[in-house]
Structure formats: structure tokens, C-alpha cells
Amino acid sequence: MNTEDAIRRGQPGSYQRVQLPICSSVALPTPSSAECSFHAALDSRVSGERFGQPTNEELSNFLGNVCRIRYIDRDDRNRQKRCVASMGALHPAHLLMYLRSMGWCVYEPSGHSLGLLPVREESSKQVLQLVDEHAPAHEGAVICLLSDYDLANNYYENCMPLLFRDAGVLMGHAALVAAAYGLSFRILGRTGTATTESLVVGIKFTAIATGLALLGSKRTSELQGRV
């Protein structure tokens, strides 16, 4: 990988943020406040082992406190303030999820909703098989980060390393949010790269796979059946 430092361009180009193509949207409920302290979240953060199917409320709490938009810059609408930090306030990573109840979707931070994505079935199968190698028989949500290379390149020369650093910050933030809400979260060591980058049909930007993770309830269907 090229490890040269990124250089901010003296004058950004004309590129405007592009959204992923969606077939339909499902609104999420309003996020609720976490009941634990920041210290407690830090102390309880561990890589998850069991992943039950997350509820809409759990998804809302997690996604709303990771990617929700707080503010959009008036002079440059590519720059946004969200819960998580990002290079130059660009937030180039799109957070995709595979949910058993919906299939592949993307979190839409402006409307706090999930957008159903058109995907290539063979690519989907390969990505899910890759995740199953890490966590066989899980019931959780697969998280995939697809970063917009063109957006970052509009502002920085040699922007590729920045995309991975940015995704790392997002994943670390997500791990703490999951801990605060009592959810299981595990960052996976692989991203699926070319397979993940070809997952979505009709994508309008250069997509770079920058992260793969699992999110779920700590109560699996197996444990629920014993109650």
C-alpha cells in the first residue's frame, strides 16, 4: 500500500457527494439515550462472540450515534458534522448492512432510515460466506464500509491511505457505541475488497472497501429459546 502522506489540494474540484442507488426506504425509530457512562462503555467494550438479530430500536440507537448528520456546511455541502470524526468533515464511508429481514441496505444519515440496495447476488453470496468464516451460524447484521474515493480525491492528493484511516476511526467509534448500548460488535480483519466493491448495482462513484464488521443483540435465538 502507498503510505505517502496525503496532501490537501489548494482548490477542491467540483465533485459533489453521490448517494448509493436505493429501491425503497424504511424509517428507523427515534434513537434513545444510552443508560451507561462513557467510562462504563470503555470498560465493557470487548469483541463480540454471540450475535443475535438486532431489533429496529437497537439499529436506530447504534446507527444514529455513529453516522447521524448534525450539520451540513452552507458553503460546501460535501462537508458534514456527524457523531463520528472524519478527515476534513467529508465522511466518505457509506455504511452498508446485510439484515436477514431486508437484505442489503445502506444507512441514510440525513433521514435516519435504511435504503434497500440493488445488489449482485453472486457478490452478496461471496461476502456473506467470507463473514461466515469468522462467525459461523451468526444471526447478526453484517456491516460493510464502502468509501467514496472520488469524494476524498476531490480534496486530497494521494487520498487512499486517508480512506482507511477514516474507516478505522469510524469502526473504533462504532465499537464504543455498541458497548454503550449493550450490543455485540466485532471488527473483522478482512474487507472482501473487489467482491465488496462490486456488490451494489449502479454505483456512481469509485467504491473502495474499507471495513467489515458484525453487529448484533447479545441475546441469540438459541438463548431466547432457553428462557
Where are these regions (language model features)?
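N-terminal accessory segments that position/regulate proteins before the catalytic core
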Residues: 1-167, 181-227
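C-terminal substrate/ligand-recognition segments
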Residues: 171
